[in-house]
Every structure is written in C-alpha cells, then in structure tokens.
Amino acid sequence: MNLHEYQAKQLFAQYGLPTPEGYACSTPCQAEEAASKIGSGPWVVKCQVHAGGRGKAGGVKCVESKEAIHAFAEQWLGKRLVTYQTDAHGQPVRQILVEGATEIARELYLGAVIDRSSRRVVFMASTEGGVEIEQVAQKTPHLIHRVALDPLTGPQPYQGRELAFKLGLSGKQAQQFGQIFLGLATLFLQCDLTMAEINPLVITPQGDLLCLDGKLDVDSNALFRQPTLLEMEDPAQNDAREAHAAQWELNYVALEGNIGCMVNGAGLAMGTMDIVKLHGGAPANFLDVGGGATKERVTEAFKIILSDEHVRAVLVNIFGGIVRCDLIADGIIGAVAEVGVHVPVVVRLEGNNAELGTRILADSGLNIIAATSLTDAARQVVSAVEGK
C-alpha cells in the first residue's frame, strides 16, 4: 500500500525526522489558509498522487503569492494528473500539499528496501539526490552506498556514521544524518514497510539536513497489525480493476495489450505472458486466481478481464495440482455463460483430471477453444486476435 507524500512526512515527524512545515489541503481556501499559517512566501504547492514525475507534469510549483496558490488548487483539485508513471487517464488529485519553499545547498538521497537475495533491509545513500535512484544505479552505480540491517540487532549508530562519511558529511551534518538514518530505520521496521525513500534529503545554506520529499510503501500483508496506516489508504488512487480483484483475493495487474490472461499461480502467470509475447501477442493483464480457484472467483476474474475494452481474446491456463481441472472447466463454462463472453476464449488444462476437463469444454457448445499445450494455447489465442 502506497502512502501520499504528506502522510509520509507526518510519519517522518513522529519518528524525529526533520521536515518542512506543510499542510494537506482539499480546497483552494484551505490552501490559502495553510500559506498564512506557514508565513511569508515563497511557497511550494504539490499535487498528492501515488506517482512520480509530478514536477515535469506541472503538479509541483513554486509560487510567490496566495492568489497563485488559490489558482493552482483550483486548477488541480478534482482533476487527474498524468505523469510518466501513470496510465493515460492519470491519477485523481484530491489534495495538495502546501509548504514553505526551502533553499537548497546540496541534495542527497537516502532510501531503504527489502533485499530478497540477502534477506535483509538494505539502506542506500547517494550524493546524487533529486533524481531517480534507478538512473543513478544505471549510470553511476559506484555513487550508491549500502548498509544492511542485521535482523537480530537492528539499525546501529555506526551504520549511520558510515553512510554519512561516505557522503562527505562531517560534524553536525554527520550527526544529523545519523539521527535521520536511525529514525527512518525504526519507522521502516515498526510500520512494516517494504520501501522508504527520502529524495531529496537536502542540506540548507545554514548547514541543516531536511527531508524535502518522502515516499513510503507499506507491506499489504501486514496491514492487519497496522490499523493506523490502514486508515491512511486512498482507494481513489488504485486502479478500479485491481481494487475489484483484491476483494476476491485475485492478484491482478493491468497491462497495455489485448489478450486477457487468467492463470493459477504467479510463476505460471508470468510464464504464460512470456510465451504469449514470444508468439507475437500482447498480454492485457497479469491475473493469478490462486490455487483455490472456484467458479465464483473464475466468474469475477472474467468480469475483471472483460472490463478492459482492449481485450480481444482470453487465454485461461490452469495447472490442476490443488484443484481438479474438471471442476475448473465447469467453472469456466458457468462463467462464460453468466458473463456473456463475446471474444474467443482459449483454455489450456494440465494436471488433475485434465482430460475430463478438456472433454467438458469441448461438449459445452460455447465459443471455447481447448488447447493441447501451452505453446498451442499461445498460438491459438494470438491467431484468434489476428482473426485467423
């Protein structure tokens, strides 16, 4: 679950990280009042959406007057912001963040992720703040410095000092960086985060460190023990189809192709998308119905896939390990009949009762094409899309 910038900064403040004074506002009048609380300008106004690239899209602006703040709020509140990280429809802007402008002498980067190869929380720091860390990793990887947290001892002060010295900090700045490191590490662990990022972490002309922007991702599997964070969720930022899928415990990710994919198992789903692409097709989605696929879940999966107007065919790839393929076949037939599927449906069944399931599909009289293998399924669904 993603958090907005203003929510991340609220948590930063709770854990002792220095942030600019700012207020999240949902009306132009509130935005003007926030500017008055902060004091004299200039101010920075930022659209609050779950996407990067806001500045280049016009969603971040430095303004000199309250009239300009009012105009910015009127321009964006209730609208959708399109950035390079969103789809063509963009993300809805329900709030803007008003902050006092900060003078910047230097920009740094500090972030943390879960490194699955080492099974540790790994902190990364760089002198190249203010740009995407992926660009730094690609072009100048030697400028990224790392430390891993031991799960038994947790973050240690010496690790913060080590990163600070590698960034060229000393004295008061090294001490401040160490405190920010410990605070962010504690926040990461206590709030069950999967990613935390301060970019940029700036040094002001007075020599103080300030968290100018923040991004936090919470582990969705841990939300049952994070009720306060769960209340921060903004459902409006989620894709409607992905939200519908989550209600049925389906893992769905929208893509840009025209072949809908329904598979049980994440690895098989990724392999299915790969082989569709290999044979010239373009997957419209990733959809994992899980090991306990039922008629109801298959029906909802069809509804979600077909809600994408670009879908011109559907590929169902089921491996019957936990589930019986004949029951899945009955579920597919019932779902196709209930939903009213008007595009070709190619089904490949393998495993427990696969032959019986294939016969059931063949005898259904519906527009369902039974495939003999995964390769055959990919070829057939691509041919169906091409009208062959």
From Swiss-Prot:
Its quaternary structure?
Answer: Heterotetramer of two alpha and two beta subunits.
For this protein, the Enzyme Commission number is: 6.2.1.5
Residues recorded as binding substrate, renumbered to this chain, are 264, 321-323
What's the protein here called? Succinate--CoA ligase [ADP-forming] subunit beta
Question: Annotated pathway, please?
Answer: Carbohydrate metabolism; tricarboxylic acid cycle; succinate from succinyl-CoA (ligase route): step 1/1
* Xref: InterPro entries: ATP-grasp, ATP-grasp_succ-CoA_synth-type, ATP_grasp_subdomain_1, Succ-CoA_synthase_bsu_CS, SUCC_ACL_C, Succ_CoA_ligase-like_bsu, Succinyl-CoA_synth-like
Q: Does the keyword Chloroplast apply?
A: no
| Gene3D superfamilies the UniProt entry points to | ATP-grasp fold, A domain, ATP-grasp fold, B domain, Succinyl-CoA synthetase domains
Q: Which reaction does it catalyse?
A: succinate + ATP + CoA = succinyl-CoA + ADP + phosphate; GTP + succinate + CoA = succinyl-CoA + GDP + phosphate
Indicate which residues the UniProt annotation says bind Mg(2+). Answer: 199, 213
Family annotation (PROSITE patterns)? ATP_GRASP (PS50975), SUCCINYL_COA_LIG_3 (PS01217)
Function noted in UniProt: Succinyl-CoA synthetase functions in the citric acid cycle (TCA), coupling the hydrolysis of succinyl-CoA to the synthesis of either ATP or GTP and thus represents the only step of substrate-level phosphorylation in the TCA. The beta subunit provides nucleotide specificity of the enzyme and binds the substrate succinate, while the binding sites for coenzyme A and phosphate are found in the alpha subunit.
UniProt cofactor note: Binds 1 Mg(2+) ion per subunit.
Which example biological process does GO assign this protein?
A: succinyl-CoA metabolic process
Q: Recall the GO molecular function terms of this protein's record.
A: ATP binding; magnesium ion binding; succinate-CoA ligase (ADP-forming) activity; succinate-CoA ligase (GDP-forming) activity
Q: Which GO terms describe its cellular component?
A: cytosol; succinate-CoA ligase complex
